[in-house]
């Protein structure tokens, strides 16, 4: 645990559409704190609606940081987010205030608490080289390369696991060290684990599924089509994270007149429900027992469960 880790932080995790943002705003008002984005898709600009970023009205209710600050033409790693959070927490005007981390990206929460190894960034040149080879040769061929260059980590990976195979090769070429060696290095915590209030929302599955459907229909009505049109106008690489946001492919198909409005909405809703299920499973299996589980944000404030850190 780092000696300068921030004490009395509030962490709010949970699947998409579970009510995290509303809870964070309520807590910010109660504590005088500020909200920090802990979601890997909400960092990207342009897609305000499809990534469910806080609305302008929400932003006016409390200070929000690290939302939409990354251009969609860029990639953004957990390590870069960690650096941005560290810089944010060091700002003079935020000292003594409660940071409220809210989002659905489990690795971000793990990094905050020091549970993620600090693997190095790799250059764009190295990254493009190995990703280009993966696209051209396939996962099985690159797994064979990894077996020769780093047999220990190759033995731990499935030959079909393209993402992890590429990552292992990138790190090996960039640093000369196996990813396994980097993973042994304990991460540095930005948030004090013992004093933090750790909350995970786990709403009723049927309720969440219905809310996801209503929310995507609202996104469509409020301008999701225009967002995707603006994104497509940038002519970006389809492999970029922003281009893989749920709804982009479906709305793009609608704009290309290869999919009806109804089918685009239905497929987006299904994809979002599947994503929420994966998030819930990750939080259930990966978060420690000291994370308190609630069905809703309202439940957090009932019965004196919420503790004002101030």
Curated annotation (Swiss-Prot):
Give cofactor(s), names only. Mg(2+)
Give one GO term, molecular function aspect: ATP binding
Its EC number is: 2.5.1.75
- Cleaved signal peptide residues: none
Q: Does the keyword tRNA processing apply?
A: yes
Which residue numbers mark the site Interaction with substrate tRNA?
105, 127
GO process annotations (BP): tRNA modification
- Enzyme class, UniProt record, top EC level: transferase
* Record keyword Transcription present: no
Binding residues annotated for ATP, in chain numbering: 14-21
User: What NCBIfam families does the annotation carry?
Assistant: miaA (TIGR00174)
- How does the record describe its quaternary structure? Monomer.
Role this protein plays:
Catalyzes the transfer of a dimethylallyl group onto the adenine at position 37 in tRNAs that read codons beginning with uridine, leading to the formation of N6-(dimethylallyl)adenosine (i(6)A).
- Can you name this protein? tRNA dimethylallyltransferase
**Which source organism?**
Brucella melitensis biotype 2 (strain ATCC 23457)
Q: Which gene encodes it?
A: miaA
């Amino acid at each position: 645990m780092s000696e300068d880790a921030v004490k009395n932080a509030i962490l709010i995790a949970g699947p998409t559409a579970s009510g995290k943002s509303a809870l964070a705003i309520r807590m910010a008002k109660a504590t005088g704190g500020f909200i920090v984005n802990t979601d890997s898709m909400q960092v990207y600009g342009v897609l305000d609606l499809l990534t469910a970023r806080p609305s302008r009205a929400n932003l006016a209710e409390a200070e929000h940081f690290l939302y939409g600050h990354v251009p969609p033409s860029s990639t953004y790693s957990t390590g870069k987010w960690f650096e941005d959070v560290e810089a944010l927490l060091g700002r003079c005007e935020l000292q003594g205030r409660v940071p409220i981390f809210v989002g659905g990206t489990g690795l971000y929460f793990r990094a905050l608490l020091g549970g993620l190894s600090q693997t190095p960034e790799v250059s764009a040149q190295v990254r493009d080289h190995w990703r280009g080879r993966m696209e051209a040769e396939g996962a099985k061929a690159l797994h064979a390369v990894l077996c020769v260059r780093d047999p220990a980590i190759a033995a731990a990976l499935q030959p079909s696991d393209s993402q992890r195979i590429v990552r292992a090769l990138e790190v090996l070429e960039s640093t000369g060290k196996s990813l396994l060696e980097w993973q042994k290095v304990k991460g540095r915590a930005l948030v004090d684990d013992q004093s933090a209030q750790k909350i995970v929302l786990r709403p009723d599955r049927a309720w969440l599924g219905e809310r996801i459907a209503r929310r995507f229909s609202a996104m469509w009505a409020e301008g999701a089509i225009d967002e995707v049109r603006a994104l497509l106008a940038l002519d970006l690489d389809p492999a970029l994270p922003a281009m893989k946001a749920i709804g982009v492919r479906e709305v793009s198909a609608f704009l290309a007149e290869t999919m009806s409005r109804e089918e685009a909405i239905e497929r987006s809703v299904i994809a979002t429900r599947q994503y929420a299920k994966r998030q819930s499973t990750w939080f259930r299996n990966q978060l420690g027992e000291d994370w308190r589980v609630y069905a809703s944000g309202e439940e957090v404030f009932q019965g004196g469960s919420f503790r004002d850190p101030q």
